[in-house]
Structure formats: structure tokens, C-alpha cells
């Protein structure tokens, strides 16, 4: 029996994200699909498709050494280690004009940034309360809206919660070490 169509749509969106990352990092040529969905109803059919993929022209254009980390129970931690491994060996990052970030498809992006319109933001911190991943943070010592890009899952709760409509999502993969650092998005001087 065929699965619900929304499962296939979700898989296609995730595959588009993976393809964009692999192409952007220099592992795959545009138009070649190293990430493919295999449809099989029988074990023999699955085996034939896997054989076709491993012997065909769909492999990565660059060999990546095997990763040496163990898979974590928490999926986001494992994904973070996979990204770190791919970045460490990425062909595009070995060039003089290496990009700082890769734009990702908006649909289903697991990574990204948040832009703040500082003229509209009143630092009410509604977005901080709404953020399930602790990507948006306040500062107990000063009126600051801070952001930890590594944690952002692009869910959009911050955008929909903001009463000033001052936030926008930016689907991307930041390639610099700053993706693992907290940065200030907006701040004001405290009264006093």
C-alpha cells in the first residue's frame, strides 16, 4: 500500500536540503543527485536499486573519509556532528573565495538565522519565550536579544509570536565557527 502523500513530500523536502548542502559544499555537481529516494516493494527490487546507485554516476564528486563519531540518541547532536565532518572535508572551503554561508531551500530547512528589524523590535522577549530550541535567548544582565544559530531549527514560532513583526527567518547553513557562538541581534542601554 502507498504511504500518505505528506510523507513523500516531507522526504522530498529533506532530500532537497541535503542536496543543497552537498552541492554548496562542493561534494556534488549541480544536476547530479547523490541523495535519492528509492521506491521498492520487494527485497530484490531494493537490492537492485541499491546496486544501481552504488555503481552508477550518482556518487559524490569527492571522496569523504569515514566519520569516526558514534551516533547519538538525540538526532540534532548527530546532525551537528555530520555537518562538522562534512565541513572539515568540504572542497569549497579549501578555496580562497570560500563562502561564509550556504543559502538553503526555505521549505523544511533545519538550519538558519533570524533577522531582526531593530527599528521595530522593542526587546519584549516574546520570541525568547516561544523558541523551543533555545536559539533565541535573553541576557539577565542587560537588555539584549541573543541568538545561537546552531540551535535554530527554523520553526518560525519566533516570527509568529513577535507582536512587532520584527523577525524574519533566513534559511542557511553558516560555514564559519560563529554558528556555534551566541551573538547579539538587538540591544539597548539599560536605564539607570
Where do the language-model regions lie?
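Histidine-anchored nucleotide/phosphate-binding helix
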Residues: 1
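Ferredoxin-type iron-sulfur electron-transfer modules and their immediate structural context
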Residues: 4-11, 23-140, 151, 160-192
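Short, surface-exposed alpha-helical segments at coil->helix boundaries
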Residues: 12-16
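Catalytic machinery of carbohydrate-active enzymes
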Residues: 20
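Accessory beta->alpha helical hairpin/"wing" motif in late/C-terminal subdomains of nucleic-acid enzymes
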Residues: 146-148
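Conserved SAM/SAH-binding loop-helix junction
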Residues: 157
